[in-house]
């Protein structure tokens, strides 16, 4: 079963369990500016700042959830509308669904951290990665999936590091003394090389997450 079918079925179960009337609940989703999404960061090369990604934010009864997309939009509809989106062939619909799912789960108290960290928080988070990795895995070779500059810069000084990304403007460039490799062309080589994979949650929205769910090595998702 497709992962989005699993997620949709899960949301349906929660709607029934908590008696959420699908026709009466409104979800408002809008695209955020980079300042709204990530604030004033030390680094200015985050994909959302340079215009390579767009943040969707869903608001469900005051609870907010976010997801990345490549297409700006506004949307207002019910949970019934969200559950009817095309999650197989439409990347924008997938992002809208994930943002909405995050908002609903936040509202129900089933998760937290459903919005992106802002201002100096990406740096604070990234600085914790090396200690965590060393404590859990010793001295592994690390594959980072997705261009996240703070994480790359903090990990590469402590561990052998390779980075995969799908954006052609990043691929084959050197960033923070690390070559950014092609997420399709170099996938097999990088994944077979790595002992540990640090993977962006954006892989769920673009459906490339299927390439990382069944790996015979530890995979940690961020964002």
Give the role of each language-model region:
Residues 146, 165, 223:
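Short beta-strand/turn micro-motifs composed of small residues
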Residues 147-151, 202-205:
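Gly/Ser/Thr-rich loops at beta-strand to alpha-helix junctions
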Residues 49-51, 133-139, 156-157, 189-195, ...:
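Flexible, charged surface loops at secondary-structure boundaries
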Residues 111-122, 171-178, 195:
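Glycine-rich phosphate-binding "P-loop"
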Residues 177-223:
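Accessory, usually C-terminal, subdomains that scaffold auxiliary metal cofactors
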Residues 1-149:
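Electropositive, gly/pro-rich neighborhoods at or near active sites that engage anionic ligands
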Residues 141, 160-162, 218:
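Residues at the starts of beta-strands that form the adenosine-phosphate
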Residues 150-181, 185:
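Histidine/lysine/aspartate-rich catalytic loop segments that bind and position anionic ligands
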């Amino acid at each position: 079963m497709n992962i989005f079918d699993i997620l949709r079925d899960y949301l349906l179960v929660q709607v029934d369990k908590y008696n959420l009337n699908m026709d009466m609940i409104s979800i408002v989703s809008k695209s955020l500016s980079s300042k709204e999404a990530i604030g004033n960061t030390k680094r200015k090369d985050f994909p959302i700042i340079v215009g390579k990604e767009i943040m969707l934010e869903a608001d469900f009864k005051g609870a907010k959830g976010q997801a990345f997309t490549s297409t700006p939009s506004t949307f207002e509809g019910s949970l019934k509308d969200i559950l009817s989106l095309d999650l197989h062939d439409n990347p924008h619909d997938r992002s809208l669904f994930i943002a909405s799912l995050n908002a609903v789960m936040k509202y129900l108290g089933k998760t937290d951290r459903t919005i992106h960290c802002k201002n100096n928080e990406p740096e604070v988070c990234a600085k914790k990665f090396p200690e965590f990795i060393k404590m859990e895995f010793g001295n592994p070779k690390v594959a980072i999936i997705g261009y996240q500059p703070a994480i790359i810069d903090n990990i590469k000084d402590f561990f052998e590091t390779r980075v995969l990304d799908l954006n052609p403007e990043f691929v084959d460039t050197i960033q923070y003394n690390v070559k950014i490799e092609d997420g399709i062309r170099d996938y097999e080589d990088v994944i077979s090389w790595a002992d540990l994979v640090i993977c962006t949650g954006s892989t769920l929205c673009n459906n490339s997450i299927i390439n990382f769910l069944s790996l015979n090595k530890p995979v940690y998702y961020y964002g």
